[in-house]
Amino acid sequence: MAHTLDSQQPAVPVRNFQINFGPQHPAAHGVLRMVLELNGEVVERVDPHIGLLHRGTEKLIEAKTYLQAVPYFDRLDYCAPMNQEHAFCLAVERLAGIEVPKRGQLIRVLYSEIGRLLSHLLNVTTFAMDVGALTPPLWGFEAREKLMMFYERASGSRMHAAYFRPGGVHQDLPQKLVEDIGEFCRTFPSLLDDLDALVTGNRIFKQRTVDIGVVTLEDALAWGFSGVMVRGSGAPWDLRRAQPYECYSELDFDIPIGKHGDCYDRYVVRMEEMRQSNKIMLQCVDRLLKEAGPVASTDRKVSPPKRGEMKRSMEALIHHFKLYTEGFHVPEGEVYAAVEAPKGEFGVYLVGDGTNKPYRCKIRAPGFAHLQSMDFLCRGHMLADVSAVLGSLDIVFGEVDR
């Protein structure tokens, strides 16, 4: 039957359009899959699907000695591996009452800040690429290459270092390496100035990031945010100042904060944090060149004997063998240790039962709390803004899925 203009049209149900963002999308930063519900080009709902990189890290750690558990932490946030080892080592040291010598603390802080540069350089450059700028990653990766060489010269590995140990670090840094790190720190600010000139004041970059993904301070705290996500919203909360660990209380640095809590503020905070990390690294280098001393605890329960000693003493050889096969025993108890990782507060809740293996090791990954807010942050924005918001969260799937 033909419809006239007056006759009733049959009702056609209008439903929103659903698309998959990832897991192969270049802006998904890993194996993230998000189901987006779109009304035209406006995002109505975001449903993140996680678990594609789940490896059962927390359970695996329960079957390993305290020393054997360290390499698992490199594989969480693989953009800044040593920062995660740091949290685990702090937890073990607090539980076992181990003192770390001053030189060991300085090396740890130095390499934690190198990790912060590695992570922030990767984030700000790929974030710029997500919104259309192609040059920053080429510049950023040149500097990251030098920093990864510092990792390699200290531990033998560019990424999965396993360099931090309960009680200190594996071995001392050569004098030349410390000098080279100092030389890098003196030239690094010019790269940040170049990035600032190219990206920070860029009109198109600002149009893509200003007033996108705004988080008020109340919302940030309610969602369990930490790190740059809180500082970008105006709270000067940094564990290096709020709950100082190692020798951070002796170092001079500032905590940059944002005003509006949008993607642009988070980017600017990360840029300024790199300058502050550079400042911390220079202070560590100056002190390492002047102050000698041990780099690991002198408590022989947790530190292996020297190579030369093992060639002379049968007891030292037995001690070395026992330490690396059975490991050291940690008293019963529970402890929470957190570090200011590049992504936010990375925490380790460790339960010891008096044996040589952890009874339970709960990992508090900052990216996990940040990812859950994707629906809240993207609702009402355009489809193109989803990758901008995701880039400003700085998510790595090693730590989200664990």
Swiss-Prot record:
Gene Ontology, cellular component aspect: plasma membrane
EC number, UniProt record: 7.1.1.-
Record field: catalytic activity: a quinone + NADH + 5 H(+)(in) = a quinol + NAD(+) + 4 H(+)(out)
Group of enzyme by EC: translocase
Keyword Cell membrane: yes
NCBIfam families xref list: NuoD, PRK06075.1
PANTHER family: NADH DEHYDROGENASE [UBIQUINONE] IRON-SULFUR PROTEIN 2, MITOCHONDRIAL (PTHR11993:SF10), NADH-UBIQUINONE OXIDOREDUCTASE 49 KDA SUBUNIT (PTHR11993)
Family statement: Belongs to the complex I 49 kDa subunit family.
Name of the protein this chain belongs to: NADH-quinone oxidoreductase subunit D
Origin species: Azorhizobium caulinodans (strain ATCC 43989 / DSM 5975 / JCM 20966 / LMG 6465 / NBRC 14845 / NCIMB 13405 / ORS 571)
Organism lineage string: Bacteria, Pseudomonadati, Pseudomonadota, Alphaproteobacteria, Hyphomicrobiales
